[in-house]
């Protein structure tokens, strides 16, 4: 589920923890104190995308200016149905590793045309850190010479992966995460999940409320739960758990990273040595994940075997040396990204 479809469920009701920042931004834009380009950052990339959809809906709404769109005017109806002609979403195409230059060029051409519904056009680039360098360079032209009355929104959970030239030409907004109570309440009262399902979804998504709901709606919770259970039981198996080869490499690494973070926070045995090894494992997995996100294409069977070997050796005293050798050899398994 993307933020497009999530938004359609209740476009007029922003989550409570986002409302303050949304209201402030709406006032800044109404007073002319906000620029034409904004980077929205959040650890929960789905939250950043939803926030941008909420902002765009307010920009298009023909009702009374407010942080919440009226939901009744022609603009609001078109937007909530996903058919608004002045709203363009750019995201990585299915089967692709990056957002390409052609996608950015298409958005630029669309912005140069006269708005169909009102006076503004909005482009949203989801997970903008996934742009290729040529795509980012093409985006610079749009940032330096914005066509007409337009608003460019970028979302990211890794702003440091965006080129400095892009970051310097955009205003930034870092979203505040919900408290545990806010996240639980939103999933139950706002999305109709029962208490146990909401608790489990938040636990599996590391407390990210919007991603938790997305996982539940996509039916991915059971797969993620099986993956987490495989991490708990991997040290008892004779080889990599079968499920590790059934999920995508990015999904496997992201899930394992979250699990290692949780495990390292809860470690109480053998004090600092064990804690340090969990941190070293996290470093190795994080480097793997970053390289895959940057376009590395390792053979899944080799990567799974290497990750399993790291995991099994995490408790050894020589693990620091193992990690050093692993990081030094990444290029040998097509992970030079």
Q: Regions from the language model: what does each represent?
A:
Residues 33-34, 80-84, 116-119, 146-149:
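Short loop/turn elements that form and flank the Walker-type P-loop nucleotide-binding site
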Residues 1-61, 66, 75-78, 148-150, ...:
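Charged, glycine-rich active-site and insertion segments that engage polyanionic ligands
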Residues 137-154:
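Conserved catalytic/switch belt of AAA+ P-loop NTPases
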Residues 94-101, 128, 172-173:
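Flexible beta-alpha connector loops of hexameric P-loop NTPases
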Residues 122-124, 153:
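Structural motif
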Residues 69-99, 160:
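AAA+/P-loop NTPase substrate/partner-engagement loops
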Residues 23-29, 98-122, 130, 134-142:
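Conserved alpha-helical scaffold flanking the Walker A/P-loop in AAA+ ATPase domains
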Residues 127-131, 159:
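Conserved Walker B
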């Amino acid at each position: 589920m993307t933020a497009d479809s999530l938004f359609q469920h209740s476009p007029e009701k922003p989550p409570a923890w986002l409302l303050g920042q949304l209201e402030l931004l709406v006032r800044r834009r109404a007073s002319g104190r906000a620029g034409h380009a904004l980077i929205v950052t959040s650890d929960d990339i789905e939250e950043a995308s939803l926030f941008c959809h909420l902002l765009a809906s307010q920009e298009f709404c023909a009702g009374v200016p407010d942080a919440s769109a009226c939901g009744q005017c022609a603009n609001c109806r078109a937007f909530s149905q996903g058919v608004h002609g002045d709203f363009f979403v750019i995201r990585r195409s299915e089967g692709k590793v990056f957002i390409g230059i052609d996608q950015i060029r298409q958005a630029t051409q669309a912005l140069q045309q006269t708005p169909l519904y009102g006076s503004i056009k909005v482009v949203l680039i989801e997970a903008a850190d996934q742009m290729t360098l040529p795509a980012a360079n093409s985006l610079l032209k749009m940032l330096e010479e914005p066509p007409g009355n337009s608003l460019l929104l970028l979302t990211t959970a890794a702003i440091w992966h965006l080129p400095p030239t892009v970051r310097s030409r955009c205003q930034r907004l870092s979203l505040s995460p919900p408290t545990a109570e806010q996240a639980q309440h939103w999933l139950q009262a706002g999305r109709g999940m029962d208490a146990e399902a909401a608790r489990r979804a938040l636990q599996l998504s590391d407390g990210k409320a919007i991603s938790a709901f997305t996982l539940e709606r996509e039916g991915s919770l059971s797969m993620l739960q099986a993956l987490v259970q495989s991490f708990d039981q991997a040290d008892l198996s004779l080889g990599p758990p079968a499920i590790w080869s059934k999920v995508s490499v990015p999904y496997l690494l992201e899930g394992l990273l979250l699990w290692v973070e949780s495990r390292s926070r809860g470690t109480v045995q053998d004090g600092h040595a064990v804690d340090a090894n969990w941190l070293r494992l996290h470093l190795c997995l994080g480097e793997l994940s970053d390289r895959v996100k940057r376009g590395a294409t390792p053979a899944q069977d080799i990567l799974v075997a290497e990750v399993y070997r790291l995991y099994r050796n995490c408790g050894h005293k020589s693990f620091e040396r193992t990690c050093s050798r692993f990081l030094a050899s990444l290029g040998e398994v097509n992970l030079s990204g």
